[in-house]
Amino acid sequence: MSVADTKKSAEQKMQKSIEAFKADLAKIRTGRAHTGLLDHVQVDYYGSMVPISQVAAIGLADARTITVQPWEKKMVSAVEKAIRDCDLGLNPATMGEVIRVPMPALTEERRKELTKVVKGEAEGAKVAVRNLRRDANEQFKKLVKDKTISEDEERRGQDEVQKLTDKYVAEIDRMVAEKEKEIMTV
């Protein structure tokens, strides 16, 4: 394994950490409706639990309302129950075959709690990125010990991985600022 391989591997893993963080942020509810909010909701479909997206079409009626239209009429009540029970504080209302899910307004206290959650998630993502940097640096040391690369190449590789780390930590900070702004917007 060379310096370039180690750097490329570290960058790919850091990118995956960012994508996982982005997915975690999407699950945090703001006052605005988005279809990804219901992604983790599981519905009892003839005895087995399946994601809501497999039994219903999910869309947006407006900025504060999600619409859920089950593909089978008899699934309406099961889907509504699953949404109500999914610890997001949502209160769905059925209108015929369509379930409307209005987004309740967030209280100031809840907004502050959510910002703390976002910061905690961000810290976890930063730690993951830094651990990947450490792993890459250990790989460089191993390559020097095996006399595969020189100490100068090790230093260059460490500097490049540090630049990657700084880039991804800055990206996490940017995403946090964006999410906090979204949460605090009334």
From Swiss-Prot:
Its annotated compartments are: Cytoplasm
Q: Which UniProt keywords apply?
A: Cytoplasm, Protein biosynthesis
Superkingdom, taxonomy of origin: Bacteria
Ion transport as a keyword of this entry, yes or no, is: no
Q: Name one GO biological process term.
A: cytoplasmic translational termination
Function description: Responsible for the release of ribosomes from messenger RNA at the termination of protein biosynthesis. May increase the efficiency of translation by recycling ribosomes from one round of translation to another.
Identify this protein by name: Ribosome-recycling factor
Organism of provenance: Cupriavidus taiwanensis (strain DSM 17343 / BCRC 17206 / CCUG 44338 / CIP 107171 / LMG 19424 / R1) (Ralstonia taiwanensis (strain LMG 19424))
Which classification does the entry list for the species? Answer: Bacteria, Pseudomonadati, Pseudomonadota, Betaproteobacteria, Burkholderiales
Recorded name of the encoding gene: frr
